[in-house]
Each structure stands twice: as structure tokens, then as C-alpha cells.
Amino acid sequence: MQPPPMRERQRWRPEEDAILLAYVRQYGPREWSLVSQRMNRPLHRDAKSCLERWKNYLRPGIKKGSLTDDEQRLVIRLQAKHGNKWKKIAAEVPGRTAKRLGKWWEVFKEKQQRELRDRDRRRLPPPLDGDERGCAGGRYDWLLEDFADKLVNDHHRRMMAAPILPPWMSSSPSSSSSPSVTLSLASAAVAPAPAAPPPTWGGGGGGEVVVAELMECCREMEEGQRAWAAHRKEAAWRMKRVEMQLETERACRRREATEEFEAKMRALREEQAAAVERVEAEYREKMAGLRRDAEAKEQKMAEQWAAKHARLAKFLDQVAACRRWPPVEINGGGGGGPGGGR
């Protein structure tokens, strides 16, 4: 008999589930390749699909629907303990399969990451407009311009505070005065000292180096902020996991304490019932012993009374036998009397 062609991967229909359930009720959960042959109804599914359908959806005892809060906390705690070993985790979560728990964990992790991304997006400052960002076009160009302005102003203030003096004014006070000094003061043909060239920011080579260093610092700051944001997001996610694990452990400990208390109460009740049963058994045994003793005493007294009655009857019989006259003597006495002599 040729096996039926396999159906393409699609959802199971209710009639296919009914065929599979009827087969399991009749033949048990084994030999899945013989479902169509034994049930005389075409089931276009291979043995592996039938096994997975039975094990993950149709097997008795499997819970359907969303996980409860206690189950979610338990799965989070077990995942932190065992990792992604879902078969091992499913063994400790009754009514849930490894496939179901793995799918729930993927959805839960994606949801947590999406919430963290949304939260970080709300916390980041809004980007600046094009006219506010300057010529560089970066996020921190306004900071670069501020740094450049501060450097230019500081340099200008230092230059104004320390002006360049001519050589004849910067001479030491210990030098002796000479007529050349008076002549140099009165002479108008003395050439003035050359003025210091103003600093060129942005046009000279030194300004370009400073701007490049500032740009590099800004890039490093931006990379540092990205790394810090990623670390912060990871830390927030781990913190939330730790909080959920702590809550799960707290609930588990509370449940374990409740179960332990109930177990102790059951043990006390059982011990009390056993003690009552022992007392009742001892009472019944003592009552039975007293009843047996009473019956034995009564029987003994009855036997004694019967023996006394027998001895008394025997004694009476003996007394009666001793007082009875023999009939020969009575007749002889009558013949020897006066009437007999006649």
C-alpha cells in the first residue's frame, strides 16, 4: 500500500486532530507512520508531524492559553539558571512544552528590548536644526564652535594683558642714564617696534590643528555616549531581569513556605488521627480484655455453682439412702407380732 502524499506545511485542521486522537485512543501514541493505514482515512502528514502535534498540542495535561504570572516568573528564574535548555525547564513547569516556553521567551525578550529602545529614544535630546549646527554638520558642532570662541577670547585677553614694549622701555632700572636716552626720546625718527601678528584661527595651520583635535574629541565623546547608552540599556534590561527574578524567588519562597506549613499541618493532623486511633485501639483492647475476664469469672462461678449443686444432690441422695427401711425387715416384724401368734 502506497503511503499518502505528504501535505505541505500548513495548520492542522480539526478533522485531522480528530483522526489523530482516535488513533491514539485505539492504538496508543506510537507507530505514527501507520495512522492512515490503520484508520482507513487519509492523513497527509508524516510521522514526525504527527508526533510533534500529539506531544505539543493534543497530549492530555497540556495547558493552553497564555502563561500565568507565576509561570512567567518561574520561567524567567529557570532561564537565568539553566539558560536556553527548554526541555529541562519544561520538566519543572507542569503543563507547558519546551516549544511553547521557547516561543514565549523569544517574544518576551523582544518586547523588553523594544521597551528599552523606546525609553532610551525618549530620553535622548532632540537633534539640532541645520542652521544651528554650523559648517561641520555634526551633532556637537555647536560645542566645537563654543570651544573655539573660548580659545580665541582667552588668547586675545592674554595678548592684551601683556603688551610688547620697545627695547628702550624694557631696559633694566640699574642701567645708567645717558644722553642717548634723551636723544632717543626726543627724536621722532626712531622706527617703531614691529607689532606682533594677530593670531589666525581657522585660516592658519595651527587653527586647523586645533579644530581637527576638537573634531576628534567630539567624535570620541559621541562614541562614548553611544557606548554609555548601550551599556545603560543593557544594565536597565539586566536590572529588570534581576527584579523579576527576585520577585519570582520571593513568590516561590512564599509558596514553598505555604506548602511547608500545609505539610506540617497535614503531618500534625495525621499524627493526631494516629494518636486517636491508638487510644481507641487500646480502649477497645482493654474493653475486650475486661469482657473476657468477666466472662471467664462468670463461667468459673457457674462451674463452681454446678459442682456445689452436684455435691449437694449427691449428699442428699446419700442421706435418703441411709434413712430408707429395708422391705424384708418390715414384713418379718409384722409376722412376729401378736397377730401372728394366733
Curated annotation (Swiss-Prot):
Keywords: Coiled coil, DNA-binding, Nucleus, Repeat, Transcription, Transcription regulation. The keyword Methyltransferase does not apply. InterPro entries: Homeodomain-like_sf, Leaf_Dev_Regulator, Myb_dom, SANT/Myb. GO terms for biological process: asymmetric cell division; defense response to bacterium; defense response to fungus; leaf formation; negative regulation of DNA-templated transcription; polarity specification of adaxial/abaxial axis; proximal/distal axis specification; regulation of innate immune response. It is found in: Nucleus. It comes from the Eukaryota. One of its GO terms (molecular function) is protein homodimerization activity. The keyword rRNA-binding does not apply. Residues 253-304 form a coiled coil. Pfam families: Myb_DNA-binding. Residues 1-58, 59-113 form the HTH myb-type domain. GO terms for cellular component: condensed chromosome; nucleolus. Residues 32-58, 86-109 bind DNA. Signal peptide: none annotated. Its main location: nucleus. Transcription factor required for normal cell differentiation. May interact with other proteins to repress the knox homeobox genes. This is Protein rough sheath 2 homolog.
